């Protein structure tokens, strides 16, 4: 994966939308680009290219190609009910410094941030992988969506 051209409509609008949802105490589930957007919009930053750090593959949409360790006592750990999960991956950027007010909830073996959340929000969870591509065969991944939908009710 590589950076595409900037989207002059999407790029400035999404951080505003995220902050508006959080201000209105609406649930947020941020996937892939979404975790990166959430972190930057709230004051964190990104690794622009993770290739120099790569020890595990980050370029397979469909396969479970690397292990993520989930921190205990986080929303993500309560949803998944396990300390490690196998995930897919399709990215070349990643969260570097986690934004103030967010907590780290998951890491890959090579130290890439795979999950962040905002504990003082109704539901605000970001994951770097694509649970939507794994949820049909993996109840833990489906649990992410079930928890999000429950928070939306």
Where are these regions (language model features)?
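Conserved G/P- and acidic residue-centered "switch" motifs that form tight phosphate/ATP-binding loops
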Residues: 32
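Anionic-ligand binding region
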Residues: 48-75
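Flexible gly/pro-rich beta->alpha loop and the following alpha-helix that scaffold active-site loops
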Residues: 1-29, 42, 47, 51-52, ...
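Acyltransferase
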Residues: 127, 131-153
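Hydrophobic, aromatic-enriched interface-forming segments
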Residues: 35-37
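Catalytic beta-strand/loop cores that center a nucleophilic Ser/Cys/Thr
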Residues: 73-120
């Amino acid at each position: 994966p590589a950076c595409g051209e900037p989207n002059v409509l999407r790029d400035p609008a999404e951080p505003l939308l995220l902050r508006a949802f959080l201000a209105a105490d609406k649930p947020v589930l941020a996937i892939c680009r979404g975790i990166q957007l959430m972190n930057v919009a709230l004051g964190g930053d990104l690794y622009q290219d993770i290739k120099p750090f790569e020890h595990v593959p980050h370029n397979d949409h469909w396969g479970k190609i690397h292990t993520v360790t989930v921190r205990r006592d986080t929303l993500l750990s309560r949803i998944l009910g396990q300390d490690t999960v196998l995930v897919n991956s399709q990215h070349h950027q990643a969260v570097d410094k986690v934004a103030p007010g967010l907590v780290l909830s998951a890491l890959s073996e090579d130290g890439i941030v795979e999950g962040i959340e905002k504990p003082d929000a109704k539901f605000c969870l970001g994951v770097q992988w694509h649970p939507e591509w794994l949820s049909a065969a993996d109840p833990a991944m489906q649990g992410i969506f079930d928890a999000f939908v429950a928070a939306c009710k």
